[in-house]
Amino acid sequence: LNRTMDNVQGGFIWDWVDQSLRTTRENEDGTYSTFWGYGGDWIDGLSNADAFCGNGVLFADRTPTAKAVQMRYDHQQVNFYPVDEDMTETDGQIQIRVVNEYENTSLSAFDIAWALKKDDETIKTGTLELDTPCMSGSTFGEETVTIELPQVEPKAGDTYMLEVTVTNKVRPDWDSSNMTYDNVVAYEQFDLTPSGLEREPLNYSMMDAFTSVEDGETVMTISGTTGTGAVFSLELDKTTGIISNYTIDGQVVLEKGPVPSFWRAQNYNDIPVYYDPALRNDDDEMELNAPAVIAVDENGKHIRVELDVKLPVDAEQTMTYDIYSNGEIVVSSAFTPKSNFAPGTAGEYALPKVGLRMTVAPGYEDLEYFGHGPDENYVDRNTASLVGLYQSTVAEQFVSKYLKPQENGNRTGIRWTSLTNEAGTGLMVSADGTVESSALHVKAEDINPSTTSYPYNSQPIR
């Protein structure tokens, strides 16, 4: 807003760093470890502001938070804007407005490069030779540039992104030779993915039929062969609608899920907001208003399961599983609220989130995803996180340096995500559009236990 409205200021920093001290505690086994202390961690009974001192853009150990990544992007002084609101109708070229916010430096001091990417593949690159002037009075220097793009034949599921990067031509005088310096002073990403491209319906006519469908009184066991020749098996609880024990070649991949999930671990700003305790689902259970409706295709290649989920809140939710004989499962979920979920209104609580949760078996540590990354990001803080293909591990997703354990590890704009073991076997989840996802070794309910204030971070400093 501070760039689009003349009467709005913004982008100011409240605190640069979390104001905390490394503090020693004695563990139950008599050993000692350290954590980042705050509030009343040293002298009980004295007035304190709890963890209010922990709102910096750097952690207490001076490493950057994901907020610092966003801050750097928001403060950059070269910015790019689309001339046309709809950038998906390119017709072979696009126009971009370039704005120079430097007070004394023209853009001739920088190298400006662009790259067109299809998914994670770069299909064309180029440079912009600009001499956009610096500010004059209170007016920024700006000009409009045209980028010629190759003709492409996009298909449903393809993602096209244009990335623009600005780097210094000459190393700055203030930068000594012993400092790490990535040379990037500004960047932007534009989504050029055409809209309206629909995926073709899954054609299961060429699939082999299920090898086995055992329909018991309360559990249906389904087995078959994947497209790669692996043997899969899963169990469906007809009473609860929960899928469990999904195995590939005898190894359990998915222990349980998906189940509705409405609980998000509170962050520090959420403390005044009331969450309905009924939303907690520590055991990942699910209840139905009526028995599951199950229909097996006469060709033995497709099973549809329809569920009317019983919820602890004033809302309705239906779920559908389309289970195919190659091991793929298409999950559809519809949530219809009957309440405003307005905290502060008599008898109403906030609804932290609407989603699904799955419990993956141990050993599936390798994480790969296509979406905003690589740092944790949220819907109100993701413009600095470029859409791309990222690899990590589940252990690396938990952000342990927050003074008070809170919601963390989220990624937005997810097209697909996967978890695999050392052998490369695993589980992949993809979306028709985009979703948010996280992969953690702890549940949201574990981060904010109901019995204590959980004063210590779950992972000590050493």
PLM regions: where:
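Residues that line or immediately flank small-molecule/substrate-binding pockets and catalytic motifs
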Residues: 15, 130, 250
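Beta-strand/loop-rich accessory regions of lumenal/periplasmic or secreted enzymes
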Residues: 149-157, 193-462
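Intrinsically disordered, low-complexity Pro/Gly/Ser/Thr-rich segments with frequent PxxP/GP/PP motifs
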Residues: 118-174
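Short, acidic/polar linear motifs in exposed loop/turn regions
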Residues: 101-106, 170, 339-341
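Short structured motifs
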Residues: 80-82, 97-100, 124-131, 145-149, ...
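Extended substrate-binding grooves/exosites of carbohydrate-active enzymes
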Residues: 1-96, 101-108, 113-121
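Short beta-strand elements
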Residues: 172-204
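Hydrophobic beta-strand positions in extracellular immunoglobulin-like domains
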Residues: 98-102, 116, 149, 166, ...
